Amino acid sequence: MPPPPVFSGGGFIFAPGFIMATIPLTRRGAEQLKDELQRLKSVDRHAVIQAIAEARAQGDLSENAEYEAAKDKQGFIEGRIIEIEGKLAAAQVIDPTRLDAGGRVVFGSTVDLEEEASGAQVTYQIVGDDEADLKQGLISISSPIARALIGKEAGDVAEVQAPGGVKSYEIVDVRYQ
């Protein structure tokens, strides 16, 4: 009997028989995953089934690149559906506006930082792995900078190992929004 299928994503493994760790998500992140799941099930899945049917109608499947591409896409879509369903089942949805962490940096908090060397100021919100988007100021809970910030409060200095060496950031403000 072949081994059960395994899907990984966001640092977690999903397979039959495994007990999954809780996956922290902000409310926005959970909604984004639900929206993606809905789109995959109601739009993408049907589109790829149609593409497979059209490719089959072309005849010989042994040398049919469109058929192979559609089957590959179908495999990706089905795998992503399983992955998202697993993440949502294991999700712990956290509403940052309801946090009261006493001014400490925790998952979901928004942190204003000042790089000590340059004086540059940045603002990040610490979110789940699937939500991270540096361009929008959303950093993953598992990123080096988030790990350095967790548990600290305004006035503390966090040292982050960056590719160019260690960078020090002073925490200017911590908000739960």
Q: Which functions belong to the PLM regions below?
A:
Residues 18, 33, 54, 86-87, ...:
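Preference for short coil/turn "hinge" residues that link or interrupt alpha-helices
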Residues 85-88, 149:
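Hydrophobic aliphatic residues
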Residues 94-177:
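Non-DNA-binding regulatory cores of transcription-related proteins
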Residues 56, 90-93:
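Elongated periplasmic alpha-helical coiled-coil
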Residues 5-82, 177:
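Helix-rich terminal scaffold detector
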